[in-house]
Amino acid sequence: MTPDPLNRLVAQLAKLPGIGEKTAQRLAFHILRAPGEYAAELSQAIREVKEKVHLCVRCFSLTDAETCNFCRDARRDERVLCVVETFADLMALERTREFKGRYHVLHGVLSPLEGVGPDQLRIRELLERLNDSRVEELILATNPDVEGEATALYLTRLLKPMGLRVTRIAQGLPMGGDLEFADQATLAKALSARRDL
């Protein structure tokens, strides 16, 4: 019989995305075997992130200040704004070290089946931001799934009349991928988005 505190820890860890019962048990045993300071630091870090991290008032990224580092960085190009679904998507783009503009995080995608419409996303704030800025190009970097495509199409129709250049990130085959293993939708997208060399 496992002690109740350990069962409670396993149950809480198993609620994390991508963590099943076995992984939760391994994590719990790791925490149990680790020095006491480790558990204290872990619980302090969790408490701190809940108390201090919130949304940037400008782009809705995560920050522990009023505005995030991306919005405060004067070296970033104010004329180019990249719209992403989540903070995780923003970080994925940042890891490429290619994008030098600014961001706007929607915190989701349009999904009528799940009851998510434009009012549940940060679209109104995006429009307000565009009215008060020097943005010339808007890059839509939503995922290439049904909801991401619907969101990109909705935003395109909404923003084109504003005279902005609205672009979409390219889609197709991954680097190092094999044609023979690519699905039909990916191949079709790669063919239609081909470019001159």
From Swiss-Prot:
Listed GO biological process terms: DNA recombination; DNA repair
Presence of keyword Zinc: yes
Keyword RNA-binding: no
Residue ranges constituting the Toprim domain according to the UniProt record: 79-174
Domain of life: Bacteria
Pfam family, one: RecR_HhH
Keyword terms of this UniProt record: DNA damage, DNA recombination, DNA repair, Metal-binding, Zinc, Zinc-finger
Zinc finger (C4-type): 56-71
SUPFAM superfamilies registered for this protein in UniProt: Recombination protein RecR
Functional summary from the UniProt entry: May play a role in DNA repair. It seems to be involved in an RecBC-independent recombinational process of DNA repair. It may act with RecF and RecO.
Family membership noted in the UniProt record: Belongs to the RecR family.
Name this polypeptide is given: Recombination protein RecR
Gene: recR
